[in-house]
From Swiss-Prot:
Biological process (GO), any one: tRNA pseudouridine synthesis
Protein name (record): Probable tRNA pseudouridine synthase D
Lineage top rank: taxon: Archaea
Keywords: Isomerase, tRNA processing
Domain TRUD: 146-365
One Pfam assignment: TruD
Its biological purpose: Could be responsible for synthesis of pseudouridine from uracil-13 in transfer RNAs.
SUPFAM superfamilies referenced in this protein's UniProt entry, alphabetically: Pseudouridine synthase
Gene: truD
Reaction(s) this enzyme catalyzes, per UniProt: uridine(13) in tRNA = pseudouridine(13) in tRNA
GO MF term set: RNA binding; tRNA pseudouridine(13) synthase activity
Length: 409
């Protein structure tokens, strides 16, 4: 990713999960007559999809009945909301889950889905850069209009940075190749049982050798064992998990577009044909009020961008996404062409739930509620804005990521 300045000092984070904490800020109204149970939990060192699966297992219910508002870094301590599609939940049965503590639970009429957050508050211990230099860089970034709103690397996998590659295969209808890449990717996987299954398709041996902790891989292999095909195998996984593959590829495309925008125009350019949105204090855009930049309003919008009232956006490609009617629109089309993808490819003819109409995302943001004491920094970011991306604008980020055999998203 392109950075606004050439800051190359390394910032190391996540030596321990406790070095990186995040608390979700949500607006969920309790309702004693609600049909859903909301749980706020302290979660340590769990992948979000895997802890959701464990919650479902402890409650003896389908994984599909457990939802959450946002995926979080695995190697971290999270205060996170989960929604159980039942008003009758034995919350005490969750007490035995390692590194998981229920902080509060209540009934609600609100069904929690991805994106149902206002913001996230972070507290991060960092190493390798002087705190005063960190503060100077922060002041510089704020004065220059913020940091580029890239999707963070964790969007593409905690350990195996290939979810966007799997997503592209799904979009192109290459389901067998997508399943195989999920089960075994030679760039990341060293376990012999993974490669053996891909080489032989011997599902009996695979189900004996794959550990039960790799529940998603086992589900895919089990589907193949029952059906003799990979085409519908992703139906055996939670839908929100499979959709994340598609979203990861869309995020990859957005990052490519934003990177090109920065190279050509920088972070703060306002072009005729750009689409802008009003933003709140957290830099959450109001997408119900798009504004197209033209020669008459360009100067006014530039001033509103400078005062953090408005932000320019770029497309997240889908089958309904409009390409910018600006000088930059040709670059957006060019990236699709380079990828060998059309917008129609995002309308999945085999599995409707894997279709995506697309979206737009603002190109820059700022942290708020910033504080720095010694080598611990705290700040708040709007939903979908990545703390690791902000840190990458301060210096070269070094994340400590597990190298164990668990395949994670």
């Amino acid at each position: 990713m392109n950075k606004p300045e050439n800051f190359e000092e390394a910032i190391e984070i996540k030596r321990d999960p406790e070095d990186f904490s995040v608390e979700e800020i949500a607006d969920i109204e309790p309702d004693p007559n609600g049909k859903y149970t909301i749980i706020k939990a302290r979660v340590r060192d769990w992948d979000t999809n895997r802890i959701a699966a464990e919650i479902a297992r402890r409650l003896h219910m389908s994984r599909k009945r457990v939802t959450f508002a946002g995926t979080k870094d695995k190697r971290a301590v999270k205060l996170q909301y989960f929604c159980i599609n039942s008003a009758d939940v034995d919350v005490a049965s969750l007490s035995g889950i390692k590194d998981f503590e229920v902080i509060e639970s209540f009934k609600s009429s609100h069904y929690l889905t991805l994106g149902d957050l206002i913001a996230n508050h972070f507290k991060i211990r960092f190493y390798g850069i002087d705190p005063e230099m960190f503060r100077e860089r922060y002041v510089h970034i704020i004065s220059k209009g913020g940091f580029p709103n890239f999707f963070g690397d964790q969007r593409f996998g905690s350990r195996r940075r290939n979810t966007h590659e799997i997503g592209k295969l799904i979009i192109k209808g290459e389901y067998e190749e997508a399943v195989k890449k999920y089960i075994y990717d030679e760039k990341y996987d060293k376990e012999s049982y993974r490669k053996h299954f891909i080489d032989t398709l011997d599902y009996k041996t695979a189900l004996e050798r794959f550990p039960h902790s790799l529940s998603f891989e086992r589900s895919l292999i089990g589907y193949y064992a029952r059906n003799g095909t990979f085409k519908g195998a992703f139906d055996s996984l939670p839908k929100n998990l499979t959709i994340m593959f598609v979203h990861a590829y869309q995020s990859y495309l957005f990052n490519r577009i934003l990177d090109e925008r920065l190279k050509i125009y920088g972070l703060n350019a306002v072009l005729p044909g750009d689409i802008a949105f009003p933003v709140d204090a957290y830099f959450n855009p109001d997408k119900s009020k798009p504004i197209e930049v033209n020669s008459y309003n360009r100067e006014k919008i530039s001033k509103l961008v400078s005062s953090d009232k408005i932000r320019i956006s770029l497309p997240i490609f889908g089958y309904k996404t409009w390409i910018d009617n600006s000088d930059f629109g040709d670059v957006e089309y060019g990236i699709l062409k380079e990828e060998g993808i059309s917008q129609d490819d995002f309308k999945n003819k085999d599995f409707a739930y894997l279709s995506s109409s697309g979206d737009r995302r603002i190109i820059s943001a700022k942290p708020i509620n910033f504080s720095l004491e010694n080598n611990v920094v705290e700040f708040t970011l709007g939903k979908g804005i990545y703390a690791t991306v902000f840190l990458s604008s301060i210096g070269r980020l070094k994340e400590n990521v597990y190298s164990d055999s668990e395949a994670e998203l």
